[in-house]
Amino acid sequence: MNHSEIVSFLWGVADLIRDTFKRGKYQDVILPLTVLRRLDCVLASTKAKVMETQARFKGKLDNLGGQLRKASGFAFYNTSRYDFDKLLADAPHLAANLRNYIAGFSPNMREVLEKFDFHNTISKLDEAGLLFQVLERFRNVDLHPDRVDNPTMGTIFEELIRKFNEALNENPGEHYTPRDVVHLMADLMLAGDENRIRRKGAVFSVYDPCCGSGGMLMITKEHVTAGVRRNGDILRPPINPGAEIHLFGQEVNPETWAVSKSDLFIKEPTGRDADNIAYGSTLSNDRHAGRAFDYLIANPPYGKDWKRDEEAVRAESERGAAGRFAPGLPRISDGQLLFFLHMLAHATDPKEGGSRIAIIMNGSPLFTGDAGSGESEIRRFILEHDLLEALIALPEQLFYNTGIATYVWVVTNRKVPARRGKVQLVDATSFWIPMRKSLGDKRREIPLERTQDILKILADFKDGDTRVITEDGKQEETVISKIFPTTHFGFRKITVERPLRLNFQATPERIKRLDDEKGFQSLAQSKKKGAAGAKEQAEGRVEQRRSGSFLERFPAGSSRTGTSSRTRSSPRPGKRSWPFPRRSRKRFFLRSPSGTKPPRSAATRKGIQNPIPSCETAKACRFPKACRTFSSAK
């Protein structure tokens, strides 16, 4: 079976448990049993040797762990006499035996399995009489590495997790990164470093602060040591098969952390990489504090707030340069830039080799935030320190549960001389092919050939580089690369003070419009109830009629002009990059007919209140409230 068939087979367990478990609880059954079945298949060939080793050294050694790990060939083992076949052979005692089987795993693997809280699920399945049927279904799928290799197994886990989230429509900001996008990001992060990586005895570290099921870390390592593979075929050779790559990560979701950790225990026999995957919130509890990494890669949650971490984040920000968030804090509704700053804080010092970073985010970090806001200050920090190497705009409809536009930021603190002080913008929105079958919202993918095109565009580093793009059946030569100095993206917010013309004329046309003005309508409204409210409304209607009569007697053709000031943001001429909305012009009651330009007054100052136009008969006016209402600003 291919990975899609395996996912469909495992997801079919939902048909058995739908009357016992709510739709949102399917993962409590399917995910831990998928992990257990994978572990069962992995350990099958060395099961007898582990049991023999335990019998031989029991009572002779205080700590059997080393011998048992050696016997199993992995960093974990299971000393229980059960496997899936033997569990099903003793159906009456299945629940108790399954618990004993889980307890037989080594301590490091038990820690992983405990994150699933599976013991309660066992009890619920047993009480419903479903435990045997469910376990039998998992026994019928072969997940041995000889039949399902590690990359395929990773895809299966991600597909299952995607289905769980899709079924619930939960965690909308968390988007599991498709493999084609991960391959592109790994290539962008490693681009230009091939000679460095090929050095004999090369040792590098890779870090993902929101690693999910670990796909980005594992694919990056495969690019270096195993090459790019698909269906067993090598599409691109490895950069350096002998390089030593250490993986580090952190994940806040317990189930995906458990999946990542168990997968790495299988892929890396010493268990070193699995031990480096920490559990907890990266923003409030940095489990890798003090470490610096050579390569950093991430897909942080889009538009997800950081309220839960607010206290710790603000405390960290107050530490200034000693903390991770010194440049600024974004708005609390979106924490993408916090993960970005966290990655910058974990970059290796340029004097010690520096780092390269690839992070994919939506458009919010590019465009959100007014001048002086947290987002603007973070962007300013990145550009003034010349950290941004390139921005790549990706096609839409690449992700499983969103079709939004995304951008890959390529960042480094060791730019080559030709790139210093410059940023390359690449339009890769047309570099896609349609998928044969959609997966959720994912209808497009980036093939390896298009990935190579993007890498070549970056390597050529050519301003105005073009490609022939086919769109709607028409071919057109399009500019897909532009290069700008970092200063091009700067702007200043300035205050422009100038007269704001307010014209007062008592013409029949304007008097007729009074009934539509809220200020005039409010004269006959009251917040009081009963007789008191009715009295105020009646008095207001009298004022309205008298005001109308007064205006009709106003000398025809005469007018008065008042002035005010307004503030707007103005970028430096020719230096606009990210658009910041200008404040709209204030609208006034009894405004001038279109096209008229009353004389401009020089009486302006910042913050001046909108003046009330003078009136020759104002002193005799019995209704100053009415005049003030329809001659002041909204």
Give residue spans per PLM region.
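Non-catalytic, mostly N-terminal accessory regions of nucleic-acid modification and defense proteins
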Residues: 1-194, 268, 272, 276-282, ...
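Conserved Class I SAM-dependent methyltransferase catalytic core
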Residues: 9, 16, 25-38, 254, ...
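Short, contiguous acidic/charged loop-to-helix segments that flank catalytic cores in large enzymes
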Residues: 20, 307-316, 321-335, 364-374, ...
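Hydrophobic alpha-helical scaffolding
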Residues: 124, 146, 210, 246-255, ...
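Short acidic (Asp/Glu) and glycine-rich catalytic loops that position anionic groups and cofactors
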Residues: 135-136, 239-242, 273-278, 317-323, ...
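Conserved S-adenosyl-L-methionine
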Residues: 175-298, 303-315, 323, 337, ...
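Hydrophobic alpha-helix feature that most strongly marks membrane-spanning transmembrane helices
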Residues: 225, 265, 269, 301, ...
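C-terminal, active-site-flanking charged/polar segments
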Residues: 378, 383-388, 398-468, 511, ...
